[in-house]
Amino acid sequence: MIDQWKVIISCLTAEHAGQTDKDGKKKILSSLDMLAPKEICTETYMVVDSFPTEVEAYNLTTYLKTLFVRFLISQLAATQHLSKDKFRLVPIQDFTSSSDIDWIKPIEEIDKQLYNKYGLTDSDINFIESMIKPME
């Protein structure tokens, strides 16, 4: 793993004890970053996945920024500590250029692709968008 590109997140959620912002929304992920080959992190961070290419790591980073993914994580994140088991509702994707998702699009467009791929209704989408704060 040391010789690959890594995507890391903080092991703590962005919210203190699950509190929402003034609009009633949550960010969920407090810190999200990529590490180049030969870079490592402390146990303060969790390595979400590692890849042979920077593009795949970047695409995973983009995926984690979507409202779709962060909503799914939030369904299992009852405390402010994030662990790998909080990701079990998150569908695995292909982050290569062969993917059925166009990872080059803006995050809002990727969310729309994911909503369509998984057959979410307008009601589902409105609920997700009312609960999760956009991430840049």
Set out the residue ranges of the language-model regions.
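Polybasic, glycine- and aromatic-enriched phosphate-binding surface used to engage nucleic acids
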Residues: 1-100, 116, 133-136
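Amphipathic alpha-helical coiled-coil/heptad-repeat segments
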Residues: 101-136
